Amino acid sequence: MIPIRLYTMKRLSFIRYACLLFMVLIPLMARATGQIADDVIIDGEEWRLLGSPLSYNDSIYNRVDSLLPKHEDRSWSTANWSGFYGCWEIVDSCLYLKKIVVNMWDEHKKKSYVLEFDADTLRSVLGEYYTEHGIYARWYSREKLIIGRGELVTYVHGGYLRNHEEELVVTIENGRITHQEHWHNKKVMEGWSLSEGGLTKTGIQIRDSFPYDQFPEMGTKLIIVHVKNISLTSDGHFEDCDASFFKKYDNGEKEWIEDPNHPIIVALKETMRKMYPWEVIYLHGKYTISSPNPGSGFTLPLVNRQQKKAEE
């Protein structure tokens, strides 16, 4: 989640914003579902494509969709809204669509089945991309596309947010791979986690362990902190992170404080440093932690609950 610069929202009180934040986030997380990945063949071996080249371009998607059976006749789910997936192959560093597999449902027989549309059939709607190797994905460019295989090391119940034991991280420009990194990932140890199952417990521990007595000016005010880019040692010790927090001034102005030397940020990091062990994932050459929002971090409310309860 990217920090929102709330000082532009002068008509919303801080408490109203906090309520709005969680009202928005909770339904989104509840609806999120991990998406079925496309298949891709590389040097004769099967991998999983953690992205959707067909959905990258609306015109391409609509042309393909118009060729397939009506959506209401397909067997679709929240893990595959379209009801179909693509089978690809990488040949000489170029990405080709070989066929599309459509999941169907026979209402009369109460039985599922599949229909396949090969490159020759797809040629009728994607003729300008047709080659002897298949449909050349010249419409597709991506700075960072993950292609994986093997057991899952991380998994978030939404989109393609997961990591496999073995991964290729590639850059694609107009259907051609221009850069590739090959990684072997693994889960090193269990501990304090930011995964969907552990984030709540970890957040409560941070909230309840924060040294509120060092900041009497906070009183019972609620502040929102944002943490991302957590770095860990291989044996589960917290090293550092990027942190910021929301501050509301007496005159009503609001802003995010990002100064790493601010006492509240220093205290937050020290609180996290005292927590041990942290879950450790070896991912793409670094020791890190799984997160429901990889690269974006998480947002956490801090409030002195004991003082607030005493005042009540």
Report the location of each language-model feature.
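Acidic, small-residue rich beta-repeat scaffolds with periodic aromatic anchors
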Residues: 142-186, 228-231
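Bacterial Sec-dependent N-terminal signal peptides
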Residues: 1-36
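Short, positively biased Gly/Pro-containing turn/loop motifs at secondary-structure boundaries
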Residues: 250, 255-312
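An exposed acidic His-Trp-rich patch
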Residues: 98-161
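Short, surface-exposed coil-to-beta transition loops
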Residues: 35, 81-85, 163-166, 222-227
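Start-of-domain marker
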Residues: 31-98, 102-104, 110
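Surface-exposed beta-loop interaction hotspot
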Residues: 173-214
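Short tight loops/turns at secondary-structure junctions
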Residues: 219-254
